Design a protein with these regions (language model features):
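Glycine- and acidic-residue-enriched helix-capping/strand-helix junction motifs
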Residues: 15-29
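Active-site-proximal helix/loop segments of hydrolytic enzymes
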Residues: 25-179
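Short, solvent-exposed loop/turn elements at domain surfaces
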Residues: 13-14, 148
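Short acidic/polar micro-motifs centered on Gly/Asp/Asn
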Residues: 6-13
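Extreme N-terminal starter segment of soluble prokaryotic enzymes
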Residues: 1-3
Length: 179
C-alpha cells in the first residue's frame, strides 16, 4: 500500500493553539512522523505532506497526493472548541466512503487507548482535503487541544507513542497487515 499522511497546518498556520501555547501543527507532526515510521517498519510506502514546521497550502497537499498515486490519504488534526470538550472523531467525504469503516475503527481504538470519548465518524463535503483527493481520504481529529488536560499531555512521549501506535496498527489492520 502507498499511504499519504497529511500533517495538518504548519509554519505560519499553527492550527488550533491550546491555552498554554501548544500548537496543533507541532502535535500532529510528531504523531504523524511516528505513524510514518511504524508503517515503514511494516514495509508500507509512505509519502508525507511535510517533515518540519512548514506551511503548505491545501491545494499543494492534495495535488501531491494525487500525483503520487497514493492508495489512501490520512489527514491528522487536533480539535478545538470549549475547554471542556474532549474526544476523537473522524471525517469522511460521505458515508458510502470506502474509509467509513476504517474511520469507525480509528475512533473506537483511539477512544479506548486515550481514554477519551468516541465522537464517531462524520461526513462533510466542505473539507478541502477530502473533496480534492482522488483516493479514499479521511481526516482524524485526535482529541481537543483546547482541553487543558489533553494539552498538558499531548506532547508527552507516552501520548505520542500510544496515539501513533494505535493509528498505525488500525491502518495496517484495515489492509490485513500487522505491526
Amino acid at each position: 500500500m502507498k499511504w499519504y499522511l497529511d500533517f495538518g497546518h504548519g509554519g505560519k498556520d499553527p492550527g488550533a493553539v491550546g491555552k498554554n501555547g501548544t500548537k496543533e501543527s507541532d502535535v500532529v507532526l510528531k504523531i504523524g512522523m511516528c505513524v510514518k515510521h511504524l508503517l515503514e517498519k511494516a514495509n508500507e510506502t509512505v509519502v508525507t505532506t511535510r517533515t518540519s514546521d512548514t506551511y503548505l497550502p491545501l491545494s499543494y497537499r492534495t495535488n501531491k497526493a494525487n500525483k503520487e498515486n497514493c492508495d489512501y490519504f490520512i489527514s491528522f488534526h487536533m480539535n478545538s472548541f470549549t475547554n471542556l470538550a474532549k474526544g476523537c472523531e473522524v471525517w469522511v467525504y460521505n458515508s458510502n466512503s470506502k474509509l467509513y469503516l476504517l474511520g469507525n475503527n480509528i475512533v473506537f481504538n483511539l477512544s479506548k487507548a486515550l481514554n477519551t470519548p468516541n465522537r464517531g465518524v462524520k461526513t462533510s463535503k466542505s473539507f478541502y482535503v477530502l473533496k480534492h483527493t482522488k483516493m479514499p481520504a479521511l481526516l482524524i481529529e485526535i482529541d481537543f487541544i483546547s482541553n487543558p488536560v489533553v494539552e498538558s499531555v499531548c506532547l508527552s512521549d507516552a501520548y505520542i507513542k500510544t496515539t501513533s501506535y494505535t493509528i498505525a496498527s488500525t491502518l495496517l489492520a484495515f489492509v490485513n497487515k500487522k505491526l
